[in-house]
UniProtKB/Swiss-Prot annotation:
The gene is gdx. Disulfide bonds: none annotated. It is a multi-pass membrane protein. It holds the Pfam family Multi_Drug_Res. The keyword Manganese does not apply. NCBIfam families: PRK11431.1 (NF008512). This is Guanidinium exporter. Keywords: Cell inner membrane, Cell membrane, Ion transport, Membrane, Transmembrane, Transmembrane helix, Transport. It comes from Yersinia pestis. GO terms for cellular component: plasma membrane.
Length: 104
């Protein structure tokens, strides 16, 4: 159950990271509220997952999900570059996340 909660926390991290972009420095109300709620929920769920998972593993997986998810949405939604090096690097991060799950 802790792993499912951790994945949800990571997905919420993606929402708040993208929300930061759409909030324009917290100058737009609705994206700012969504961002702050997602931040709080993400950190709360991360802390809850850490009750059962090693802190280093949980934090690395959480940030990895956030980094990969945010980069993918940056490419898809925001028109950020999708170079081969970037895609391969995201694949390496994803492989690391999977490796941490398998090792714990």
């Amino acid at each position: 159950m802790a792993w499912i909660i951790l994945v949800i926390a990571g997905l919420l991290e993606v929402i708040w990271a993208i929300g930061l972009k759409y909030s324009h420095g917290f100058s737009r109300l609705t994206p700012s509220i969504i961002t702050l709620v997602a931040m709080a929920a993400s950190v709360f769920l991360l802390a809850y997952a850490m009750k059962s998972l090693p802190a280093g593993t949980a934090y690395a997986v959480w940030t990895g999900i956030g980094a990969v998810g945010t980069a993918i949405l940056g490419i898809v939604l925001l028109g950020e570059s999708a170079s081969l090096a970037r895609i391969l690097s995201l694949g390496l991060i994803l492989a690391g996340i999977i490796g941490l799950k398998l090792a714990s």
